[in-house]
Structure formats: C-alpha cells, structure tokens
Design a protein with these regions (language model features):
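Membrane-helix boundary connector in multi-pass membrane proteins
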Residues: 66, 79-100
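Core segments of alpha-helical transmembrane spans in multipass integral membrane proteins
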Residues: 15-19, 36-58, 70-77
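Cytosolic juxtamembrane helix and N-cap/initiation of the first transmembrane helix
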Residues: 1-18, 108, 112-123
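Non-cytosolic membrane-interface motifs at loop->transmembrane helix junctions
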Residues: 33-41, 91-102
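Short juxtamembrane and helix-loop transition motifs at transmembrane-helix boundaries
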Residues: 1-6, 22-37, 93
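Short, aromatic-rich membrane-interface segments at the entry and exit
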Residues: 34, 61-68
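Hydrophobic alpha-helical segments of small multi-pass membrane proteins
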Residues: 68-77, 99-107
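Juxtamembrane "helix-exit" motif on the non-cytosolic side of transmembrane helices
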Residues: 22-32, 80-89, 118-122
C-alpha cells in the first residue's frame, strides 16, 4: 500500500471517529444515553484536534511530527481501545455493537496512522 492510500485510510479513520462521537452526542441529547462511556463532546474535541494536527503534519519538522504521532498512538491505544476492553459494563454502552465499534474504529486508527508514519520514514 502506498502512502497516498494510507493517507486516505487515515482521513477515513478521523471521519469515522468524529462521526461516531457526534452520533453519540445526538443520542445523549435525544435519548439520554451515549454510545460509549466516552463523553461525546470530549471525544469530538480531541479527535478534531488530532485531525487538525494530522492535516498540518506535512509542514512540520520530523521530530515534532513523531512526538505528536506517538502521543496520538498512545492515547488512542490506552483511552480508545484498552479502556473500552477493560471497562465494559452494559450500563456504560448503548449496546455491545457500540462497544465493539469503538474498539474497531480506534484499532483501525492506530493501524492506519502507524502504517502511514512507518511508510514516511526515510530509508
């Protein structure tokens, strides 16, 4: 897979993640129940900030870019995957599908961002 394809996957990830949090926010406001235990406003804000940094990463020097990517990978792995795996409780999730979707979307993000970063390391 070339870096253009990987770049498209990363854009798809952020679109999915932000959309998931927006749907969760709408559900909270209409049904008083979120998709996951993550606060949807916090989730949307964090994902939007990371997406903005991703969009600007082409103009960044290598070291700051790597620091941001490593921080992103760490935070999404711990808060977006492991937290959901460890803390599953039916009252914190709309359904098992929403629980699984949060884990799947964030796993896709870690994989796509990680692969894109590796592909950009000069040989």
């Amino acid at each position: 897979m070339n870096s253009t394809q990987l770049d498209s996957l990363v854009h798809a990830y952020f679109a999915l993640a932000i959309s998931f949090n927006i749907v969760s926010l709408i559900m909270r406001d209409t049904l008083d129940k979120t998709l996951t235990s993550t606060d949807p406003v916090t989730g949307t804000t964090i994902m939007s900030a990371y997406y903005a940094m991703f969009l600007l990463h082409g103009s960044m020097p290598v070291v700051p870019k790597l620091i941001i990517v490593l921080a992103f990978l760490y935070s999404i792995t711990t808060a977006g995957i492991l937290k959901h795996i460890r803390n599953f409780s039916p009252e914190n999730y709309y359904s098992r599908l929403s629980w699984f979707s949060a884990i799947a979307i964030n796993s896709f993000g870690v994989l796509s961002v990680g692969l894109l970063t590796i592909s950009q390391i000069p040989s």
